[in-house]
Amino acid sequence: MNNNLQGDAIAAAIDVLNEERVIAYPTEAVFGVGCDPDSETAVMRLLELKQRPVDKGLILIAANYEQLKPYIDDTMLTDAQRETIFSRWPGPVTFVFPAPATTPRWLTGRFDSLAVRVTDHPLVVALCQAYGKPLVSTSANLSGLPPCRTVDEVRAQFGAAFPVVLGETGGRLNPSEIRDALTGELFRQG
């Protein structure tokens, strides 16, 4: 397999995801690493790679809101809250939603909620559409190192054989803003 995922990049990335492996890809601000949210094996590989404890919880990134619905509980949202969220999506704003009991703990960590985002990065939209579901998404960097902004930086941190979807980031300087879906409270400035 070509580990740089050249040629039919989306199909090659999906093959890697279906093998319960982790891929790197450009997002709005930095490269992300991601995997199948329904595979505990894949998520544990991602957490080990990042040296991140499972109790911190993760973010899902999706092509559209429908892809996120199996993982979140939006029944408590008012029409005004929905309008606020949908006015920011697609885009670089992550919202923390209540999570139903069916959402795996390997995604939510110690929380009863899950952070989710509908991306506006064309390559990630195409990847999630082709895969048919969201991806776990976290910044592509090893513990203690800055997030990768280029393919070369990904290769330097993760190795030349690490599967990377080639492309450019969206040019944003900061990672996504994170807000509570119910209260609007700002958790991280974007």
UniProtKB/Swiss-Prot annotation:
<keyword id="KW-0963">Cytoplasm</keyword>
<keyword id="KW-0819">tRNA processing</keyword>
<dbReference type="InterPro" id="IPR023535">
    <property type="entry name" value="TC-AMP_synthase"/>
</dbReference>
<dbReference type="GO" id="GO:0005524">
    <property type="term" value="F:ATP binding"/>
</dbReference>
<dbReference type="Pfam" id="PF01300">
    <property type="entry name" value="Sua5_yciO_yrdC"/>
</dbReference>
<comment type="similarity">
    <text>Belongs to the SUA5 family. TsaC subfamily.</text>
</comment>
<dbReference type="GO" id="GO:0006450">
    <property type="term" value="P:regulation of translational fidelity"/>
</dbReference>
<dbReference type="InterPro" id="IPR050156">
    <property type="entry name" value="TC-AMP_synthase_SUA5"/>
</dbReference>
<keyword id="KW-0067">ATP-binding</keyword>
<dbReference type="GO" id="GO:0002949">
    <property type="term" value="P:tRNA threonylcarbamoyladenosine modification"/>
</dbReference>
<keyword id="KW-0547">Nucleotide-binding</keyword>
<dbReference type="GO" id="GO:0005737">
    <property type="term" value="C:cytoplasm"/>
</dbReference>
<dbReference type="GO" id="GO:0003725">
    <property type="term" value="F:double-stranded RNA binding"/>
</dbReference>
<dbReference type="InterPro" id="IPR017945">
    <property type="entry name" value="DHBP_synth_RibB-like_a/b_dom"/>
</dbReference>
<keyword id="KW-0548">Nucleotidyltransferase</keyword>
<dbReference type="InterPro" id="IPR006070">
    <property type="entry name" value="Sua5-like_dom"/>
</dbReference>
<keyword id="KW-0808">Transferase</keyword>
<comment type="function">
    <text>Required for the formation of a threonylcarbamoyl group on adenosine at position 37 (t(6)A37) in tRNAs that read codons beginning with adenine. Catalyzes the conversion of L-threonine, HCO(3)(-)/CO(2) and ATP to give threonylcarbamoyl-AMP (TC-AMP) as the acyladenylate intermediate, with the release of diphosphate.</text>
</comment>
<feature type="domain" description="YrdC-like">
    <location>
        <begin position="7"/>
        <end position="190"/>
    </location>
</feature>
<dbReference type="GO" id="GO:0061710">
    <property type="term" value="F:L-threonylcarbamoyladenylate synthase"/>
</dbReference>
<protein>
    <recommendedName>
        <fullName>Threonylcarbamoyl-AMP synthase</fullName>
        <ecNumber>2.7.7.87</ecNumber>
    </recommendedName>
</protein>
<dbReference type="GO" id="GO:0000049">
    <property type="term" value="F:tRNA binding"/>
</dbReference>
